[in-house]
Amino acid sequence: MSDLAPHELRILVAVEQEQGFTAAAARLGMTQSAVSHAVRSCERKLGAVLFDRGRHGARATDAGARAVTYARRILRLLEVMGPEVRGAGAGDAAGEVTGPLRIVAFRSVAAHLLPPVLARLTARHPGLTPQVRIVRELGRGAAGEVADGRADLGLATLDDSAPPPVPGLLAVRLFEESYALVHPQGHPAPRGLPLVDWDENCGSYTRDWWGRQDWIPPATIDVEDDSVAVSLVSQGLGMAIMPRTALLGAPDGLAVTGLGPRPPTRFVGYVTTPELAGTAPVRALIRELRALALPEGLERV
């Protein structure tokens, strides 16, 4: 099997992202026939059909999706290789860290914990350019984005079991947070209120506890965002059971009540690839994450 060249990897990524040869060609400044020829060449080299062609465009096959994942990760390593080598050659004396840093995180962490981290990070390393995307913690979540080569580091919920959420990644816990009952302030019986819930709320870390609570009713309102759930509770539409990070910056008129001596908890940490874990931008971000002063209700682990 012949090796794929970097330009071929870029073509595979573009075709997968644009879901078609014509759009990929326009993005890359190439002709459609050149892109089609390059994809056929990649398929011959790899011995697999990478894209299903049709009127719908070009959709990655299972083999193609795997190839594109490797392509993204290899291209990212090529991108960071120059700065890493130059830093090593200079003895890293200046501590200069430059270039893009791709971060994915779920909403509450991105909104409340990342800003001070990135403020310190960019103050120390002005040449660093963080790029932050919000990813819902459903399915493979932030870890899947890292595994697929779309992000350098993800801030994710980590189960109480040791293995990372996606095989092949490095996963490190940063803190543990408890869940609490949030309800309108002054309500005499908040546990009797209707339940407002959101679909990222119940992972394996809460499911067992939730199942043992006979006082929790079925959800009256289901939403897709924890901030919407908090807003609905603030308007008197019910109560919610939420992790502490989701309650940071909550509006006035809310009360937060503990769930007993052994409330459900979850771990939050970072995931990255073994290859990127040692790069200067990722190391710099991890240092700032570890130095973050945690709000009340979050305990470092």
What positions do the PLM features span?
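Short helix-boundary/capping micro-motifs
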Residues: 13-31
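A short LG(V/I)-centered, amphipathic sequence patch enriched
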Residues: 21, 43-62
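Short loop->beta-strand "edge-of-pocket" segments that line small-molecule binding or catalytic clefts
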Residues: 102-104, 177-182, 186-206, 293
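Secondary-structure junction motif
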Residues: 157, 191-218, 235, 278-286, ...
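Beta-alpha-beta core module
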Residues: 163-173, 177, 228-277
